[in-house]
């Protein structure tokens, strides 16, 4: 699960603060709308396994990019 908060969209980028389950540190994310890719990000030490969580956020921004984005979104999978 990943919670995206404070989602903001400009012509070039979508930014947000991500809260990954079991991780106490928020992560700043920036999605490049032209490249349709997440810009480089920094995960806290020992949280390399969270890369897949960021990938889910990236896929969400790719699909929701043309519609109006909410200020907050929770993404869950199994």
Regions found by a protein language model. Name each.
Residues 25-78:
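Acidic, low-complexity intrinsically disordered segments
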């Amino acid at each position: 699960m990943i919670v995206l908060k404070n989602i903001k969209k400009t012509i070039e980028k979508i930014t947000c603060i991500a809260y990954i389950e079991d991780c106490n540190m928020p992560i700043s994310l920036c999605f490049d709308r032209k490249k349709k890719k997440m810009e480089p990000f920094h995960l806290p030490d020992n949280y390399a396994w969270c890369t897949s969580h960021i990938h889910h956020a990236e896929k969400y921004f790719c699909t929701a990019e043309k519609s109006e984005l909410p200020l907050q979104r929770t993404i869950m999978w199994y």
